[in-house]
């Protein structure tokens, strides 16, 4: 009976004026895991709701922290709309080790095109395209966490 249903169902739908595309793609990961491309490039400071800025910490040039805004080169980032990466020179914001757990650290790492380096803006949030989780500045370091609407997950782009 299944082959008959397969043939009859499209005919029945067409008779009722309902036309379906040849292929339907369903995202089974749910609405919290969408990763649209950014609408345009953004650059400059990335400010937290607390008025601090994302900053490269210390001499290792990998650790990211929140710090008083001063507009120097170590606080200037660029969101590349084409690749979905947030860059600081030739390095990208990277969820360390490709982790997806809450609290996984976000560092600067050589850009490599992997999903753990792709991000998108969602209102004032910056979300990982890999996990759908939000960039979070709750601790002194940056991490990803399940999006919860807190001010630690709200960021503003621009300025120097």
State where each predicted segment sits.
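C-terminal motif of bacterial Sec signal peptides marking the signal peptidase cleavage site
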Residues: 14-15
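Aromatic-rich beta-strand patches that line glycan-recognition/binding surfaces
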Residues: 63-68, 104-110, 142-146
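Sec-dependent signal peptide recognition
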Residues: 2-9
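Short coil/turn segments at the loop-to-beta-strand junctions that recur within blades
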Residues: 71-73, 112-115, 149-151
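Short, low-complexity, Pro/Ser/Thr/Gly-rich segments in the mature regions of secreted, periplasmic
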Residues: 146-160
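A detector of repeated loop/turn-to-beta-strand junctions in beta-rich toroidal repeat architectures
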Residues: 61-63, 74, 103-105, 152
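Glutamine-centric residue-chemistry signal
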Residues: 75, 108, 117, 153-154
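Extracellular glycan-recognition/adhesion modules and their associated mucin-like linkers
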Residues: 18-60, 76-100, 118-141, 157-160
């Amino acid at each position: 009976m299944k082959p008959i249903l397969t043939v009859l169902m499209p005919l029945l739908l067409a008779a009722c004026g309902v036309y379906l595309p040849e292929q339907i793609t369903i995202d089974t990961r749910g609405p919290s895991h969408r990763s649209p491309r950014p609408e345009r490039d953004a650059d400059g400071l990335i400010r937290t709701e607390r008025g601090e800025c994302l900053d490269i910490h210390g001499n290792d040039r990998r650790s990211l922290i929140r710090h008083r805004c001063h507009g120097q080169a170590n606080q200037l980032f660029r969101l590349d709309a084409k690749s979905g990466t947030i860059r600081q020179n030739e390095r990208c914001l990277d969820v360390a080790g490709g982790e997806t757990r809450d609290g996984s650290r976000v560092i600067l790492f050589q850009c490599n095109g992997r999903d753990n380096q792709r991000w998108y803006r969602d209102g004032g949030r910056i979300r990982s395209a890999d996990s759908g989780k939000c960039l979070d500045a709750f601790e002194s370091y940056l991490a990803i966490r399940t999006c919860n609407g807190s001010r630690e997950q709200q960021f503003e782009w621009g300025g120097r």
